Structures are given as structure tokens and as C-alpha cells.
Amino acid sequence: MAYGEPYYSSKPDKDFNFGSTMARRQMTPTMVTKLPKFVRNSPQAYDWIVRGLIFPTIGKTYFQRVVVITGGLEDGTYGSFAFDGKEWVGIYPIEHLNLMSSLKLIHKANALQERLRLSQEEKATLALDVQFLQHENVRLKEMIPKPEPRKIQMKWIIMGAVLTFLSLIPGGYAHSQTNNTIFTDMIAACKYSTETLTENLDLRIKLALANITISDKLDAVRQILNFAFVPRAHWLRTVFYYIHYYEMWNIFMFVLAIGTVMRSARPGTDLVTLATSHLSGFRMAVLPTIPFHTTMTLWVMNTLMVCYYFDNLLAITLAILAPILGIIFLCFMEDSNYVSQIRGLIATAVLIAGGHACLTLTGTTTSLFVVILTCRFIRMATVFIGTRFEIRDANGKVVATVPTRIKNVAFDFFQKLKQSGVRVGVNEFVVIKPGALCVIDTPEGKGTGFFSGNDIVTAAHVVGNNTFVNVCYEGLMYEAKVRYMPEKDIAFLTCPGDLHPTARLKLSKNPDYSCVTVMAYVNEDLVVSTAAAMVHGNTLSYAVRTQDGMSGAPVCDKYGRVLAVHQTNTGYTGGAVIIDPADFHPVKAPSQVELLKEEIERLKAQLNSATENATTVVTQQPSAALEQKSVSDSDVVDLVRTAMEREMKVLRDEINGILAPFLQKKKGKTKHGRGRVRRNLRKGVKLLTEEEYRELLEKGLDRETFLDLIDRIIGERSGYPDYDDEDYYDEDDDGWGMVGDDVEFDYTEVINFDQAKPIPAPRTTKQKICPEPEVESQPLDLSQKKEKQSEYEQQVVKSTKPQQLEHEQQVVKPIKPQKSEPQPYSQTYGKAPIWESYDFDWDEDDAKFILPAPHRLTKADEIVLGSKIVKLRTIIETAIKTQNYSALPEAVFELDKAAYEAGLEGFLQRVKSKNKAPKNYKGPQKTKGPKTTTH
């Protein structure tokens, strides 16, 4: 029968080619058009199975074969479908491990492609939004009016020039004469020479008399520094030469005038203030008082300074009266404005009166300037109440923060010692297990999870509506299924079979919420925080500044036991939902027995209520109605008993059906326990108290350490281990249990199973056959041990000696040794063992003398041999437990090595190859070269 080409739904299906090729050849166009909706570009497995194994079939059609397709569907399920001739019918899924692995990878790749597509669409949308925003930004910038360059009016320029001219006129501050002649120059030169000579004479006299004062030393140092750091021909000397004609106020007023004209928002008011302060002579004393003034009080001050230029007494009188008049005439103002105006008038009065006093006494207002600055600093110091003050710009933005506390820069260890004090508390260590954490990745975002038992626990809002989520653990990605989500914000995921965490967290049996520890992975870094917690019903709150991605993290106590699952983040405090052991499993429906018990209680309650009503209220009813409605107590009890009897009978039948295989064995005479010490005699006795068990749990010990401690405590309580006879096996007595009590045995009868005891080969005749035996091939001789036989044994030997001699005479005959064919599986090196040497009876005392005296085991040899046996046993047990048999060759190697060191036969023997050479095979080509002959 000719078949068509194999059918492949896609290129991946052709590349993988899972299943039977013959089944693919059976595909017809009708079958192809009716195929289920498998995942696009995914492989399928085709099977050609007997019809009777799938559908109920009788007759010849039982052995007909049908095509079965297995693959992944678009809805995310895995299924198998068989074609019954009309359509594809779903059957129980056939597990193809390679197909399932491939579908898992394809599903993950499709999910990543979908996420990539959504990310690209989102990126394109965001890029378009950015372009729109850029265009809108450019359009709005064009709509903003550009500030015009500031124009300075000519009148202010002229006023500034006048002030500059006034400040630069030396005037009365010059120190040079106007009329200079040759005589005046000669007089000045002579005067300078005379002063210089006088200073030199005074200096020499002081040096001679040693009468040098501190002022003389300071003058000398100043001259040295002047000539050392400033050369004689330098531009600084020229600048200072011309500056000394002016006072500090002239220079300062010149700078202020230029700055006011260029940058001031009110140049007129500022220039008028500079001019009046210069004309009145108050000068620098005016500047510290300007912050206390308002616009009105500033013009009052300027007016009084102009008045002072003409009549100082009138100006002083008006300045003193100004605050009094202001208090009276400005009382209609608002409080804030009223206070500001009065403060400015008081500052004006202080300036005019104090300036006049300073000018009269000292001729300058420098002292008043210093006093006003000192008052301002004291006022600022009284404002510094907080630990720091903030400096803001015009928009209210904080540009700097200055601490008010005075910091000792040089000797600050005294302050630190005083602040630190003495430690009165000790912080405890907490147990954390980073290996029990993982990252939960969903299309909506990422969260944290932890391993507990066979589940992965996380927050329910992290999982969302997803049925499968990705679990990232130690750089690998796994897919886990959501198993159960209780009413709390908790989700339980089934741990994948190929995921083996290094640690797992356990629930706390005695929860302590006073101090909690939160640990999670944030940006692939482990973060841990400890804080005090408060309980609010089923939730916890703690002052921890948690971050996004920590939802689902475990909240543990100091022993590393889980208390709750992290849930919320408010920026300052974190919240968690408390987890209980009952949350791990869904609430089970009540069993049939419980339902019956509830029904009985309900019927009893109804019966009691009916009885009470019957005793309190009695009404006349017809006899027919009474016959229909009256129910006695006995009837209700009988109904309940009947229902309970039926249900209990059903329950007993089910239990008997389950226990039927175990009830067939009858009780008989057994020998269980014979030949060994009884075990578990202390079973049922508590070896650990409740306090000891709780203490071990609170220490957070792992399973191995916990078991070691229990074994140690049991050993101390018992005093000695249980003894077990190694030569006794329960399998030897299995046949006794099949015999009933009604069977009688004849214990004197000897049953022969045709299993004769082998007779050891005679050792004396061997010496006649082989007169010169080799030393290595001699059998082991136990004659070194002194013979100690009882009287009974000697009598038995004497009685059997004649029979033995007759048997030896019949057996001992010279037999010519013949060659025996080699065994198919035998050792190919060393001498053949003498098998007769192994055929002898020996007891425990004989075993001590098997080896010759020089080769007997010492205590050290026993220790070394015991360590090797323990090592081999550990390797084998570890391989069996972990199902990793790659270490077994190491055990075989150690066994061969020990046998080689002891001179014994190795565990592995080379087997002679059964491959025989062909009949005409001449062997390998000779490489020795041609033969050379000599003549």
C-alpha cells in the first residue's frame, strides 16, 4: 500500500519531527482541515495507536490503528486528539517529555515576543508624545514676550555722574600744597631729611640703651614686610599713592553709584539717598539702617538729612518728634504696616541724633556704623532658635541650609563623647536566608516571593489574574502555576519540579511581632531592614521605607520564621498581612459524617422545640388531621437510627473493601523476634519535654543538626543502643505466617529437600598427587590453632573414624590431572584460585586464625579498614539518596585499591573477548621491515 509524504504543519514541526512518521503519512486533507487549533509554529507529536486502546471497540476493528496528535493549544493547555473517522476527539493527554519541554520554550518565546511587541508599541507612542511636546514647547516659547533691554534715563545718568564727581573731588581731604616753588621744595627736602635723621638717632639711642618697645618692633616688622613683598617699583604702590587722598566712603559711594545706575530697579531713590548721606556727613552710618525703612520713612530720612545740611538743630528736633507724630497720625494703618512705619521713623531718629553726636565728638560716624552693625548681629542671633535656618531666593526656593549649632572643628572629641554617652542596650542578631527568596515576574510588573514547604508564597496583587507566572531564582527563569489564593492578599504557587531552592522558610509557631525583619531583592541586590511592628487585626505596620518590587517579601522574626507577607508601601511605613498555617490549604467541604451529625443536631433541636410547643399549647383538631400531622418522639428517633445505620453500613463496607487485602492473612505461630533483642521497647515514652522541643525549634536549627541533637539526647537517656542480630532476617520466617492454627506438625519428622551438604575435598590426598606444591597455591591451614574439643566431640570422632578411613581408601586413587577448558568469565592475570580452600566449616574462633600470624589485623589495621568501609558506605548511600550514580565508579576504584593493597583479587576482572578472528585473518601488517639474508 502506497502512502503519501509525511505531513508537517510548520517548519518547527518538521525540524523536531516528534512521534511516528507512519502516522504523519496517514494524514488526509480532511484530517488537516479539521485539526484542532494548535499554537502557531509549534511542533506536534504523532502516534499511530491501536483503536481498541482508545475507543471501546469489538470485532476486527479493534486492531485498526488511528492517528493521535499531541500538542499545545492556543488557550495554553496541553492535549491529545484522536481521529475517529469524522472528527478529532480529545483523549487523555499523552506525555511526550521532549514535546513538553519544546512547548514550554516556545510558550516563553511567544510571551517574550508579545512583551517586546507591546514595549515597541509603547516606545513608539512615547516617542510620538515626546515629539508633540517638543513642538508645543517651541510654540509656547515663541508666544512668551521677550524682555526688552533695560533703558537708563538720562537724568539718572547725570545724577550718578554728579555723585561720582563729588566723591572723586579731593577737596579738604588733600594733603598737598597748591603753590610749589624751589624754596618750598628745598624746605620739604630738608624737613624730610631732618625727620629721617631724628628717627635714626632715636633708634640708635634705643638700641644703645636697650629701650626698644613693642611698637618699635611692630613698625620694623611692617617695614620689612612692605619692602619684602611689595617692590619699590610696583603698580600697587602707585595705586595706594593716589588712593590715600580719598577716604573709604568716597570709594564706596563711587561703586554704589555705578551699581545703582546699572542694576537698580529704583535708581532715583537710591541715588538721592547716596547724595543726602554724602552731603549730611553721615555717610557709612546710613547704609545699615536702610532695611528698617519703608518707602515713606526713607524719604523722611532723606528730607531730614538735607535739613541737617542747612540747620542741624532743626533736623534733630524733627527727627525726635517724628516717631511721636507717626504713632498718632498713622494709627489708621493695618498692624503690619503700622509697625513697619513706626520702626522706620525710630531708625531715622536714632540715625540723626547719633550721627550728630558722633560728628561733634569724633568728627566721623564710624563708631555709629559699628554700633548699628552690632545690634543687627545680636538681633539675628536671637532669631536662631532652630537647629538650622534656610536661605531662600526670590522664588522661595531653598538655596542653602546653615546649621545654627556652633561646631568645634579642632577639639570635637569632647562633644562627641558627651553626646554618645554610655551604651545601655544591646542589639540582637537576626537570622536571614537569602536562598529562600525569588523574584516573581508578570506582565504587569515584578514582585518578591519566598519558598515555604512545597509552595512559593507571594502577594496576590503581584500575581493578579495570571494563571502562570515566571519565577526568577539565581539567574534562571522558571514557570510556576498559581495553586491557591485565599481571601487575604496572599498567593500560593506550585514550586516547579526542576527548581531546587537552597533554603526554605518556616512559619513561626509562637509569633513575636515586637521586632520584625523584612528582606527582599531590589534591583538584584539583597536589602534587609529591622524595625518594631504593631498589630492591627490581621495586618502589621512597621516604620520601614520600602521600595517598589518588595511586595510579597517575607516578614520574619529574629529566628528567621515567617510572620507575614509584605503588602503595602506608603513611603514611610510598610504594611503586611499575617499568614497562618490554615491559609496554605483551601477550606475543605464537610464530610458526610459531619453532615449527618449536623443533621442529627438539627433534628434534636426541632424535636425539643416541638415538645415544648406541644406542652404549652394544646388545640382541638380533627382526628383525621391528627393522624396526618402527629409525629411521636419514637418515630423521629427510629428515622434517625435508620439513617445512621444505613450510612454506617456504607462506611463499613468501604473500609472493609479497602482493608480486604490486609485481612486475608491468618494469625499463626511465628518466630518473629527470635534470635534478636526486642526493639522500640521505649516507644511511646517522651524523650524530649515540651520545653526542650520548643527551645530547639526557636534556635532555628536545620534538619540535620536537629536530628543529631535528638540522637544524642536519646543516647544519654537510654544508656546503650539497641542490639540487633545481623545474621537474622525477617524473610526467613515469612512462611510461618501462612500456616493456620488448625495445622499440626510432626516436629520429629526429618524433611529431605535433596539438598545434601557438600563434602569437603580431602586435603591429605592432595599432597600425594602434588608432591611439590607451590607456596602460593597451598590451601589455608587452620592447624595453627590448638584443638580444643569437648568429650562429646571426641566420642563422635572416634565413632566416625573407621568409616572415614574406608571412605578415604575408596576415594584416594592416583588421578592424572587433566587440562580443563578456560571458563568464559575468568580472570586473565594471576594464578587461578584453589576453590577447595574455600570449602570448609569454620566458626567465629576459627576466623581469628584464617590469616597467618604475621598478617593478622592489628587495632590500627581495623581502624583503617573501618574508615575505608565507612567511606564506601557514605559514597553509595549518597548516590542512592541523590540518585546521582556518577560517584559509584569512585567507590569501585576505592574497593579495588583496598583489595590490591591487601593482596586480594580485584572487584573488576578483565573478561576475555569473545570476538574471534576470521578464518583467513592473517593479523596486522608487520612493521619490522624485510628480512635480510647473508650469503
Curated annotation (Swiss-Prot):
Coiled-coil portions: 104-142, 587-620
Active site: H461 (charge relay system), D489 (charge relay system), S551 (charge relay system)
Keywords on record: Coiled coil, Covalent protein-RNA linkage, Host membrane, Hydrolase, Membrane, Phosphoprotein, Protease, Serine protease, Transmembrane, Transmembrane helix, Viral RNA replication
Effect of Y3H: In strain: Dresden
Reactions catalysed, as given in the entry: RNA(n) + a ribonucleoside 5'-triphosphate = RNA(n+1) + diphosphate
Effect listed in the UniProt record for changing L659P: In strain: Dresden
Disordered, as annotated region: 756-828, 915-935
UniProt xrefs under Pfam families: Astro_1A, Astro_p19, Astro_VPg, Astrovir_pp_1, Trypsin_2
Entry protein name: Non-structural polyprotein 1A
Gene this chain is encoded by: ORF1
List of residues that carry O-(5'-phospho-RNA)-tyrosine: Y693
Biased composition annotated in UniProt, kind: Low complexity: 922-935
GO molecular function: 5'-3' RNA polymerase activity; serine-type endopeptidase activity; serine-type exopeptidase activity
Gene Ontology annotations for the cellular component aspect, listed alphabetically: host cell membrane; membrane
Top class in the EC scheme: hydrolase
Site (described: Cleavage): H175, S176, Q419, S420, Q664, K665, Q755, A756
Annotated consequence of substituting I290T: In strain: Dresden
Keyword Protein biosynthesis attached: no
GO BP field: proteolysis; viral translational frameshifting
Membrane-crossing residue ranges in chain numbering: 239-259, 286-306, 313-333, 344-364
Superkingdom, taxonomy of origin: Viruses
Organism, as annotated: Human astrovirus-1 (HAstV-1)
Miscellaneous comment as given in the Swiss-Prot or TrEMBL entry: The sequence shown is that of isolate Newcastle.
UniProt-listed Enzyme Commission number(s): 3.4.21.-
